[in-house]
Amino acid sequence: MDEGVNLVFHKKVIDGTAIKRLISRLIDHFGMAHTSHILDQVKTLGFQQATATSISLGIDDLLTIPSKGWLVQDAEQQSLSLEKHHHYGNVHAVEKLRQSIEVWYATSEYLRQEMNPNFRMTDPFNPVHIMSFSGARGNASQVHQLVGMRGLMSDPQGQMIDLPIQSNLREGLSLTEYIISCYGARKGVVDTAVRTSDAGYLTRRLVEVVQHIVVRRTDCGTLRGISVSPRRMPERIFIQTLIGRVLADDIYIGSRCIAIRNQDIGIGLVNRFITFRIQPISIRTPFTCRSTSWICRLCYGRSPTHGDLVELGEAVGIIAGQSIGEPGTQLTLRTFHTGGVFTGGTAEHVRAPSNGKIKFNFNEALVHPARTRHGHPALLCSMDLDVTIESEDILHNLTIPPKSFLLVQNNQYVESEQVIAEICAGTSTFHFKERVRKHIYSDSEGEMHWSTDVYHAPEFTYSNVHLLPKTSHLWILSGGSCRSRGAPFSLHKDQDQMNPRSTERERRYLSSLSANNDQIRYKFFSSSFSGKKKDDRSPGYSEMNRIICTLPCNLIYPSILRENSDLLAKRRRNRLVIPVQSSQEREKELIPHSGISIELPINGIFRKKSILAFFDDPRYRTKSSGITQYETMGMHSIVKKEGLVDYRGINEFKPKYQMTIDRFFFIPEEVHILPESSSIMVRNNSLIGVDTRIALNTRSRAGGLVRVERKKRGIALQIFSGTIHFPGETDKISWDSGILIPPGTGKRNSKESKKWKNGIYVQRITPTKKKHFVLFRPVVTYEIADGLNLARLFPPDLCQEKDNMQLQIVNYIVYGNGKPIREISDTSIQLVRTWFILNWDQDKKSASAEAAHASFVEVRAKGLIRDFLRIDLVKSPILDPRKRNDPSGSGLISDNVSDHTNINPFYSKPKMKQSPRQNHGTIRTLLNQNKECPSLMILSASNCFRMGPFNDVKSQNVIKESIKKDAIIQIRNSIGPLGTALQVVNFDSFYYFITHNQVLLTKYLQVENLKQTFQVLQYYLMDESGRIYNPDPRSNIVLNSFNLSWYFLPHNNYENSCEEISTIVSLGQFICENGCIAKNGPYLRSGQVLIVQLDSVVIRSAKPYLATPGATVHGHYGEILYDGDTVVTFLYEKSRSGDITQGLPKVEQVLEVRSVDSISVNLEKRVENWNEHITRILGFPWGFLIGAELTIVQSRISLVNKIQKVYRSQGVQIHNRHIEIIVRQITSKVLVSEDGMSNVFLPRELIGLLRAERTGRALEESICYKAFLLGITRTSLNTQSFISEASFQETARVLAKAALRGRIDWLKGLKENVVIGGMIPVGTGFKGLVHCSKQHKSIPKNKHFFEGEIRDILFHHRELFDSCISKNFHDTPEQSFRVFNDS
């Protein structure tokens, strides 16, 4: 120091970092000897001063931060609000956990930042402050736990415990906090001893991989380098990357060279690079060295110990292994010190600079609605968004970066310092993330229900795991279940009404609840809001049209179950249960028109003699127009046409045409209705043959006599088939209308009677100015069977008239005697319909008539769905008979009397008018094949609660859909709780007939024509979104077990024109807690609307669980879940805990190449593209070489960045060249393909990349291999030395294989020489090796070996490869391949 270097005199307090910089400068100026002398003086000075000051720690020195109280209180308030939102179903468990953690972490972090200023202001010479902030002992985290708060803890798996420790160690911990603290600190894998051994094993494996890497040359002569751009990385990392390296190319500024190739880079040169902002710099690294099993001085660069180029013979491999392994060993101790305390990062916030109105460009391309990771609604910016805040006197412009959440609306007023945006927590805040599964467990017992508008496709076809496509709620509908143990009998029978209290008494005999595969669901039919049905009919309607218009065709289930005699329904007094065929068995069948259709009234109440179902027998079906006749004219009887009266949604049977004869006749004819303008090509009363053109685009299907009638706006063209007979003068025919001659009435042996054995229809035809003649038309005879064989339709015990409820069968002919029947566009015409009438004996003692209540039970046993229709007799107040046909009373529900007819399982007979809370539950038995152990589900009334009354609710459950201008369909919306009871009245409007294949006959059908009977039966079904679907009769009905609604393929005509009047509350609707449906009405609890009445609703309590896309739902729809069952699993990202505990396994994962995402997807794609193009340019031999090299180089860069990221996130600085040496070894092998090179290497043999290149050049043939990434363990077992491998692992296997192959160990590494006791080839022992290599170099070589075409291509390949690599590193904006940047 006396030599006098002009040093600047500084007078300021310095910390540990400043001392490090000072020592570095001292070494540069004075060298090692002088620096060590200076440091000795500093050390002596420090000890002397510390002794004189006599610093000691006492409990009084721990000063608590004054602002802690209100900070903790504020955090608690936020947690409470969050808990409430979670309970309401607004945020799901992961969002709640994430926000809770961030709230407490932000509080803890704020306290930590307050700590240093607090000490400075109150007591700058506090011993705790001096020690920790000088770096002498302890760190900020430990002091924070002493005087701030311990904060959030990690559990042994590294998961966060969301209950924070609010106390600090100065105040002392409560019992709960102490247990959480212990749980986080020393348990399981977090334990220090375990981690230390892991770190030691990692060091051993690392050294094993690189122990033979020694500096053995000065220059390998490589021309390649790796580019580093100062513009692409932070300055600090740029300096760390360059210092100590050697340049691979000359560096020019303009035409002036400022640094030459092979020059090492010091601090001065780096500063010049930064100052001039020059182009990317190409440097030499261990990756570019051409040596196979060692390294040269220039590719390694400066030695980190003394700052000069590394000496020959230095064992750089072992230094690299130790440098990476040692921080792991050291840092495991940190776990114990911080005690598993969570450290992470929170998102950065953008705050408003002043009060004012915020404005931005609300464009869907720029922003779209989203949920933040805390579940709050926000706008997600897809690119940079310019935001303006207009205050009174100034405009503030802010730019919100892409992928950020905007938390305010456009034109909203914001206050100063209000958070307006949340910047995505990227690399700057959360250093380290991982994907974690979080299971959510049910905290109550009940049935599982999914939102009806979400279809959950199973992940696997037969599993019970479903993925969620969009955000929706999962509901657990409350309801108890129990399973009897071993008892073959039960106190209750199936479907009994029961009291909930009896269940509690019985539960003593029941075992604990257990899961069961059989599930049951129950559907209720309930009344809707009252609404008068508008009468949209025009005055021109005839009586017949009114009948068609009001005929309800509520097609609920297509067919009655015929097979499965083991599922016979139980029958008891006052009850009838009918099995309905499940649609799973019918999935592949087309819908048969002959199926039994069950009709249910709107409110589920049957009156006496109500129609339960009807059956269309296919034998009585025809596709042609014609006339029906009941025997001869005098023999038929027409009962008065009352039809089916729609009375409060109940179909009472009143006969239309009922036959008294056992057979009837059908006279077919062909009818064409043509528009007025059409040109007819046949004359009236002319005879034509089959397939004759009768109009421009119309041909006849049958031959016969043509009758043409002109009507007002159309032409009716009839074709009568048959034979013409000209009567003699003796035959007097005095009738013009036709007469029916049934079979067997004429002369028995005459020719005519044999010819017309089915009977004939005789019709007299009188053409103008011509002789009249008689037309004999063929007749089809239909015999009516004596009743239908019900045994094949219903279980036999239902048809017997026992007890007091029975089914009666009535056949009737749909059309009147002599009435013409017209076909409409290829639909078949049903001539006879069979009605099943529900009847029971009138109880003479009771003053009120009984009604029957219908409901569906769906039982799911062993994967099969069985539907049962249950009908119960109940007492109901009788209505005045005079009001029955009153048109004003034809609404859905018009007065309060109907409320009490709405029987459901929560109303028992004697307590009908009381609140459901005091009423009974229903017990239902699951159909179990194991008869000894039936499973029960109890739905008690205590799970329901009643809200009401509503005074100002004005709404009607009517959904309107307009198909054309005048056509209005009225649909009675009485969807059951699970969305199943779809009941729709088919409609006719004034001008429009809609047939099965949507042919509109508007032009040809007028009001006069409508007096004839057309059979148009149209069914409409409504899905859960309120759209109305028209089912195609040829489509398959699929019962979707996910939402139990009938689905049909929609027709486009109806989709566009639907309009819905939304209702306030509808049956089956789910209501979240605190919702309010009336203006001053009560706040509801969360649940499902079960009953809606004029003044009240009944809601079944349910617990909502919010689930976001990508979540996995466990279990099936309608499955019974027990307390503690898994409902849903979320997949989410979370930040890692702050200890090396989590960092070390991650390093190991990367080094052992276990991680799936060790090479990013972009990189894989880029490699594939490169391989394709290169192969196309150069052909296969060189294409393989360059493709493999490029893959290896890119994966090396990616691996180095990954490992550095882990260590830097832990605050550990490791020089890149150490990691590069390790990565070079694990990426230096290639796998020989099975085709090619079979005469040199074995297929699938692992060989070094450089060896494969050289062999290919020597043999002058194509090389087939691919890059292969080995972990450090496998690399240690695939070296050139079998002695080294055997001393590492699997000694016997390695030695046996080496003996069989006859392997030779050349003893090039350190370990094998140590094992056999030789001199290791490093340091002084290195000189013998160098001497040998000089002799080796004196062997004469063939100078012309590389001449000719191969040499040219090879050099071309080298230049191309270098330019491609450098280009690739700089021209990829989405992921620049900077070598040493922690992205």
Swiss-Prot record:
- Provide the alphabetized UniProt keywords: Chloroplast, DNA-directed RNA polymerase, Metal-binding, Nucleotidyltransferase, Plastid, Transcription, Transferase, Zinc
Q: Which reaction does it catalyse?
A: RNA(n) + a ribonucleoside 5'-triphosphate = RNA(n+1) + diphosphate
**Cofactor(s) the protein needs:** Zn(2+)
Q: Where in the cell is it found?
A: Plastid, Chloroplast
**Entry-linked CDD domains:** RNAP_beta'_C
Give the family from UniProt: Belongs to the RNA polymerase beta' chain family. RpoC2 subfamily.
- Subunit comment for this entry? In plastids the minimal PEP RNA polymerase catalytic core is composed of four subunits: alpha, beta, beta', and beta''. When a (nuclear-encoded) sigma factor is associated with the core the holoenzyme is formed, which can initiate transcription.
Q: What is this protein called?
A: DNA-directed RNA polymerase subunit beta''
